[in-house]
A protein has these predicted regions:
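Sec-dependent N-terminal signal peptides
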Residues: 2-21
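Short helix/turn-capping signatures at newly exposed starts of structured segments
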Residues: 3, 20-143
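Short, well-ordered strand-loop elements centered on a beta-strand within folded domains, enriched
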Residues: 119-126, 161-169
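Short, exposed beta-strand-loop hairpins at the edges of beta-sheets
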Residues: 148-168
Length: 171
């Protein structure tokens, strides 16, 4: 009887070790897989943008999100949002700025929204001239004259002045 007990204990230990090693290897494989998956950078900005203490221009994630076509201001995305979305996000008191080539531009809190004849947000200009060191911050992250050509937008940087996000024309 003693020998049967020893065999049962040895079998249980061997089987437990084998199952534990298999489960452990499986978990290691899953962790390695998760670590290699890339996440698309995004940046959502809410509130007044053009003010002295704004640190967004110093944040590399701000530029990475613009590069990857994944930036939203007050929940608004160029090429997807509508004029109704703009009014809902920033208020009905947007001021008409000017009209050019079928696009009407509205301004609120130093952000200019370009709305096409179909009511779609096709242009967003973030004024940055009031932000401390805006010229240097942009130059630290973007080459002079560089334009981000993303899937649905073009992003142009005018150091010390503005950042323009423009929807690509649909063909």
């Amino acid at each position: 009887m003693n020998q049967v007990t020893k065999i049962a204990v040895a079998t249980t230990l061997s089987l437990g070790t084998l199952l534990g090693a298999t489960a452990g290897a499986s978990a290691i494989h899953a962790d390695a897989h998760a670590a290699t998956e890339q996440q698309t950078p995004y940046y959502t900005y809410n509130g007044l943008f053009n003010f002295k203490g704004n640190k967004a221009l110093e944040d590399k994630n701000f530029y990475r999100a613009l590069q990857h076509d994944n930036f939203k201001y007050e929940g608004l995305k160029v090429g997807q949002s509508t004029f109704a979305d703009v009014k809902k996000s920033v208020g009905n008191d947007v001021k008409k700025y000017y009209e050019e080539k079928g696009v009407t531009y509205y301004e609120k809190n130093d952000v200019i929204f370009g709305i096409d004849s179909e009511g779609k947000l096709v242009n967003m200009t973030l004024l940055i001239e009031k932000i401390n060191h805006s010229d240097k911050s942009v130059r630290d992250h973007v080459k002079q004259g560089e334009i981000y050509d993303t899937k649905t937008t073009h992003v142009a940087f005018y150091s010390g002045n503005s950042i323009v996000i423009k929807a690509k024309e649909s063909r």
